[in-house]
Amino acid sequence: MEKINNVTEFIFWGLSQSPEIEKVCFVVFSFFYIIILLGNLLIMLTVCLSNLFKSPMYFFLSFLSFVDICYSSVTAPKMIVDLLAKDKTISYVGCMLQLFGVHFFGCTEIFILTVMAYDRYVAICKPLHYMTIMNRETCNKMLLGTWVGGFLHSIIQVALVVQLPFCGPNEIDHYFCDVHPVLKLACTETYIVGVVVTANSGTIALGSFVILLISYSIILVSLRKQSAEGRRKALSTCGSHIAMVVIFFGPCTFMYMRPDTTFSEDKMVAVFYTIITPMLNPLIYTLRNAEVKNAMKKLWGRNVFLEAKGK
């Protein structure tokens, strides 16, 4: 069958059809996006400009913050502008690029969270060999692996979609281009493509979740052998990570580990993992982590002192 593609652009339905609600959402999500940028940039700068960057855990945390900024920036700016726009359109090429970006940075974040769980496992269960196992070369290779894995996943998703014919309609009941809403617009049978898309996303999400579950199960068992202070410190750092895993994996599992169907709740769930989660990341890691808070106080307190002294 020859591919027929009469669609040159798509039209988003957006978050709401009510102008009043859209104005409120514009203010709220503009504020959220600013928090995402400032909060994650603060973590990146604090880690990179302090001794924390030498620690594998904070090395990965800085890149997690970077990915969070990129991940939310794929969808948030366009969504915010569209909230006040009469025509919420995106070109066909722009749609495919957005689909790629969402899955690339989303999958990369999953892999980084998995690597961070392994890092905590080595730190708590094999403390004497920690710096030998998690040396900088190993960390760089792991980080590279997360980016390569994210790229392979997203390129497969996009390749499955671009080979489909789109001849109309071109209205997407969403605020960004994602696989399931776009598949509904293809003018051909998409059952097999939907199964492959779900298998691709499901394998990554389920496989990563199993690794996370095993890592933290072993960690919790090993904590019984440690002192009260050791348990408190370990639970503090692991607690932050577990919180991020739960609030990110929960919505992603609902969206991608299911058949090729769409639900009315999809847009609200998508808001949670594309905007709310990246916004909560800095809060969770700073409020529950004494080392990050102390590094921020020392670094930014010193800078303020130097500026005052210079004047």
From Swiss-Prot:
Keyword Zinc: no
Annotated localization: Cell membrane
Mode of membrane association: Multi-pass membrane protein
UniProt GO cellular component terms: plasma membrane
Xref: InterPro entries: GPCR_Rhodpsn, GPCR_Rhodpsn_7TM, Olfact_rcpt, Olfactory_Receptors
Residue ranges annotated as Extracellular topological domain: 1-23, 78-98, 157-193, 257-267
Glycosylation sites: 6
GO MF, one example: olfactory receptor activity
Regions that span the bilayer: 24-47, 56-77, 99-118, 138-156, 194-217, 234-256, 268-287
Ranges in a coiled coil: none
Cytoplasmic-side segments: 48-55, 119-137, 218-233, 288-311
Keyword Disulfide bond part of the UniProt annotation: yes
Superkingdom assignment: Eukaryota
Keyword terms: Cell membrane, Disulfide bond, G-protein coupled receptor, Glycoprotein, Membrane, Olfaction, Receptor, Sensory transduction, Transducer, Transmembrane, Transmembrane helix
PROSITE patterns assigned to the protein according to its UniProt record, in alphabetical order: G_PROTEIN_RECEP_F1_1, G_PROTEIN_RECEP_F1_2
Disulfide linkage: 95-187
Function: Odorant receptor.
Family stated for the protein in its record: Belongs to the G-protein coupled receptor 1 family.
Protein name as annotated: Olfactory receptor 4S2
Species this chain originates from: Homo sapiens
Gene that encodes it: OR4S2
